[in-house]
């Protein structure tokens, strides 16, 4: 009697094992909901589609699909016909109309309010209200699904170390054909680590950056306690020290604001700033120093305009101005460079005042993952007339004092960064960080690359060859994954065929741009109630934001106003390069991969 009962129980368990939503049947952003153990229902509400799996377009959806050009066609138009775009850029009405469309079409792809997180694959108050989570643009794959990608692919994913070594690890440095430089590389790291701050004690789905956007906590500290330690408490300024007549961050001893430094770093080189990991490399501390100087400079401007204001009002208003400067620089310099567009992007919050737009943001785990642009890093770092290896560069703030910011800016502006897409360009020094990106994606149960492409209105790849644009890697990937619909998001982004002459492939741009623009324009200062001169101390403060640029930031805060940009500048042929890789320094005994641990896993 026991045997038939056990058999029946096993059959029932087997019958209940596979969640019908594991096959991801609902298309076009339809929501899959189970109705019993073996049935599902697709909610097609407001998708523009109908039918059992939300696959039949409504009339206007069909018309839109017929008329809408592909993302690659749009990209081609925007990156060619320079003469036409020069005319459009000088006609305000046309430029504003196109910019408004760019902002709305991109940002409307982001769910706002947020919907899912790594623990909730369905809408819940917890997923909406708990700021300690990163949100998710697609729900995690169910624990009870037959394969890690739902029903597609093999039951076990290939070894992540093998994926890194076979497809991601650099053999020879591949420069970015778009001309991106190291100045851009460190700006990207510095800027994004105000909102990419994974709480590794809780898990990869959690964040310590509760502001979920551009709040400059990497300058001012994540908590009020840290902020107060960094503040001078006079004239709104941040604490600083003067070295050889120039302003630098204070030391940890001066602020008592803890930073992450190895024990060997001398006390006088333990600079203290808002983000505790920014002592990792001098490039990050360079930008931290520039923004420290900019904050204190703007405080002086406001103090002159408002001698009646106390320390708190000067500090808070300056912070809002620097948030505005940051967003302006990111859109008009940083995103402009990445896009490669001849169309001139514009930061103007008023473009959205008559649009359906929510002034809130929640950082997505997928956005954090795709931003792991380790291929940008060069093999060595060239500053003035010297060359530093990773070992010599890590936790070495003496480089900044030895060369000064002017030489660092000049040198980083001339040095080429690496191409991100196309595979095989992650430096060996950070291969463990790339492996961690894959492992954490698996822990959070990301859906496949193709599911993310569909989520962001892209056609899924039909083969590995279509993904990579070549045969060798494609064949090896097919052998390991078995099915293109089982290809993982992060490795897929890095091995994808780059667009012609570009740093990224199609997927990175079409997924990353919506997250980026929604996060920037969804900032509180861009809302109608905030975007007015009085918020920023009057016309003078408003003017600082509206005229901000990377070059102006450097000119106002770096001695000699060195010329800079986010693309490679022609080197001056008069300077010889000395390789210091054989010199005896305290940094030689450091293993860089040991230093790139949890606290810096996103750097």
UniProtKB/Swiss-Prot annotation:
Binding residues for substrate: 106, 341
Glycosylation site list: 53, 90, 130
Entries under CDD domains matching the protein: EGF_CA, prostaglandin_endoperoxide_synthase
Disulfide linkage: 21-32, 22-145, 26-42, 44-54, 555-561
Induction: By cytokines and mitogens.
UniProt-annotated location(s): Microsome membrane; Endoplasmic reticulum membrane
UniProt xrefs under InterPro entries: EGF-like_dom, Haem_peroxidase_animal, Haem_peroxidase_sf, Haem_peroxidase_sf_animal, Oxylipin_biosynth_metab
Protein function: Dual cyclooxygenase and peroxidase in the biosynthesis pathway of prostanoids, a class of C20 oxylipins mainly derived from arachidonate ((5Z,8Z,11Z,14Z)-eicosatetraenoate, AA, C20:4(n-6)), with a particular role in the inflammatory response. The cyclooxygenase activity oxygenates AA to the hydroperoxy endoperoxide prostaglandin G2 (PGG2), and the peroxidase activity reduces PGG2 to the hydroxy endoperoxide prostaglandin H2 (PGH2), the precursor of all 2-series prostaglandins and thromboxanes.
Keyword Oxidoreductase tagged: yes
Record's signal peptide: 1-17
Organism: Gallus gallus
Positions that bind heme b: 374
Name of this chain's protein: Prostaglandin G/H synthase 2
Keyword entries, A-Z: Dioxygenase, Disulfide bond, Endoplasmic reticulum, Fatty acid biosynthesis, Fatty acid metabolism, Glycoprotein, Heme, Iron, Lipid biosynthesis, Lipid metabolism, Membrane, Metal-binding, Microsome, Oxidoreductase, Peroxidase, Prostaglandin biosynthesis, Prostaglandin metabolism, Signal
């Amino acid at each position: 009697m026991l045997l038939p009962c056990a058999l029946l129980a096993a059959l029932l368990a087997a019958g209940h094992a596979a969640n019908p939503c594991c096959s991801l049947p609902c298309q076009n952003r339809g929501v899959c909901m189970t109705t019993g153990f073996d049935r599902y229902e697709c909610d097609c509400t407001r998708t523009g589609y109908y039918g059992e799996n939300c696959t039949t377009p409504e009339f206007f959806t069909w018309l839109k699909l017929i008329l809408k050009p592909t993302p690659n066609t749009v990209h081609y138009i925007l990156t060619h016909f320079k003469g036409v775009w020069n005319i459009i850029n000088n006609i305000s009405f046309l430029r504003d109309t196109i910019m408004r469309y760019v902002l709305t079409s991109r940002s409307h792809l982001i769910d706002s309010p947020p919907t899912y997180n790594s623990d909730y694959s369905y809408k819940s108050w917890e997923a909406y209200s708990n700021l300690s989570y990163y949100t998710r643009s697609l729900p995690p794959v169910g624990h009870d699904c037959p394969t890690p990608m739902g029903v597609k692919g093999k039951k076990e994913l290939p070894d992540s170390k093998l994926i890194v070594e076979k497809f991601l690890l650099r053999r020879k440095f591949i420069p970015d054909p778009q001309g991106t430089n190291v100045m851009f590389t460190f700006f990207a790291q510095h800027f994004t680590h105000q909102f990419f701050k994974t709480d590794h004690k809780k898990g990869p789905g959690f964040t310590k950056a509760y502001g979920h956007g551009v709040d400059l906590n990497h300058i001012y500290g994540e908590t009020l306690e840290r902020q107060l330690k960094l503040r001078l408490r006079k004239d709104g300024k941040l604490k600083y020290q003067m070295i050889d007549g120039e302003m630098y961050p204070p030391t940890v001893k001066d602020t008592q604001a803890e930073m992450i430094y190895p024990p060997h770093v001398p006390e006088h080189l333990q600079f203290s700033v808002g983000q505790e990991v920014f002592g990792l490399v001098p490039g990050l501390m360079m930008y931290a120093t520039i923004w420290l100087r900019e904050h204190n400079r703007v405080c002086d401007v406001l103090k002159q305009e408002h001698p009646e204001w106390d320390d708190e009002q000067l500090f808070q208003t300056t912070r809002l101005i620097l948030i505005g400067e940051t967003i302006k620089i990111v859109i008009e310099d940083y995103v402009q460079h990445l896009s490669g567009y001849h169309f001139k992007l514009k930061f103007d919050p008023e473009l959205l005042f008559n649009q359906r737009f929510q002034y809130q943001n929640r950082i997505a785990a997928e956005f954090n993952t795709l931003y792991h642009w380790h291929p940008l890093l060069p093999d060595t770092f060239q500053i003035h007339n010297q060359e530093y290896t990773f070992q010599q560069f890590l936790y070495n703030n003496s480089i900044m004092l030895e060369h000064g910011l002017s030489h660092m800016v000049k040198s980083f502006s001339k040095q080429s960064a690496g191409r991100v897409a196309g595979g095989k360009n992650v430096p060996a020094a950070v291969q463990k960080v790339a492996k961690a990106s894959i492992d954490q994606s698996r822990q959070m149960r990301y859906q496949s690359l193709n599911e993310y492409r569909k989520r962001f209105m892209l056609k899924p790849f039909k083969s590995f060859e279509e993904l990579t644009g070549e045969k060798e890697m494609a064949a090896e990937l097919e052998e390991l994954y078995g099915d293109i619909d089982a290809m993982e998001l992060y490795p897929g982004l890095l091995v994808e065929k780059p667009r012609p002459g570009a740093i990224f492939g199609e997927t990175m741009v079409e997924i990353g741009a919506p997250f980026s623009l929604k996060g920037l324009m969804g900032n509180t200062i861009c809302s109608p109630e905030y975007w007015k001169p009085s918020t920023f101390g009057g016309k003078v403060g408003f003017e600082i934001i509206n005229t901000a640029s990377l070059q102006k930031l450097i000119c106002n805060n770096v001695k000699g106003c060195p010329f800079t940009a986010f693309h490679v500048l022609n080197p001056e042929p008069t300077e010889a390069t000395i390789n210091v890789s054989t010199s005896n320094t305290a940094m030689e005994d450091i293993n860089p991969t040991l230093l790139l641990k949890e606290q810096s896993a996103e750097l």
